[in-house]
Each structure stands twice: as C-alpha cells, then as structure tokens.
Amino acid sequence: MSLRPLHDRVIVKRIESETTTASGIVIPDNAAEKPDQGVVLAVGPGKKNDKGELSVLSVKVGDRVLFGKYSGQTVKVNGDELLVMKEDDLFAVVEK
C-alpha cells in the first residue's frame, strides 16, 4: 500500500532525535523539548487560493523538516509509522 497526499498535505517519516550527546551523556525525554524532525516522503498537488489558482507547496520530497511534537496524524504503512500533516504544520526546512 502507498499513500498519495491530497491538497496541501505532506507525508513525513519521523527521524528519531539523538538521546545521547557525543560525550556519552544521556538526555532525558523531558529535557529534549525541541521540534521533531522528519523527511518528506510525498507532497500533495497544492491547494487553490482565493482566485482559484493552484498554489504549489514549498517543500519537496527528500526535504528534512521540523514540526511540532503533536503535529499530524500517524498512520502505519507497510510496517512504517508515517505522519500525514498540512504544510502549515511544518516549522522549517533544514538546510544543509
């Protein structure tokens, strides 16, 4: 099974954040209150603006993005947990 997002939705695979520093210090979950990261797996075609024109999304497949801990809806596809969310739920694209 595969997913094709509609409108301004994106499908993101969460990247687990590091829980140990380079020096070996373990970071407890409650101390790691920072945005989650993920990789965009699929993007919808966009959504129509007030003029009826299609506004394409700012993110593309392969982008690494930041989003809130409770953003999106979790779905399980072929054993993987993926997130379906609106582009507005994304905070930023991580530039290399």
Swiss-Prot record:
UniProt entry keywords in alphabetical sequence: Chaperone, Cytoplasm
GO biological process terms on file: chaperone cofactor-dependent protein refolding
CDD domains in the record: cpn10
Location of the protein in the cell: Cytoplasm
Domain of life: Bacteria
GO molecular function, a single term: ATP binding
Gene Ontology cellular component terms for the protein in this record: cytoplasm
Subunit (UniProt): Heptamer of 7 subunits arranged in a ring. Interacts with the chaperonin GroEL.
Annotated function: Together with the chaperonin GroEL, plays an essential role in assisting protein folding. The GroEL-GroES system forms a nano-cage that allows encapsulation of the non-native substrate proteins and provides a physical environment optimized to promote and accelerate protein folding. GroES binds to the apical surface of the GroEL ring, thereby capping the opening of the GroEL channel.
Protein family: Belongs to the GroES chaperonin family.
The protein, known as: Co-chaperonin GroES
Organism in which the protein naturally occurs: Paracidovorax citrulli (strain AAC00-1)
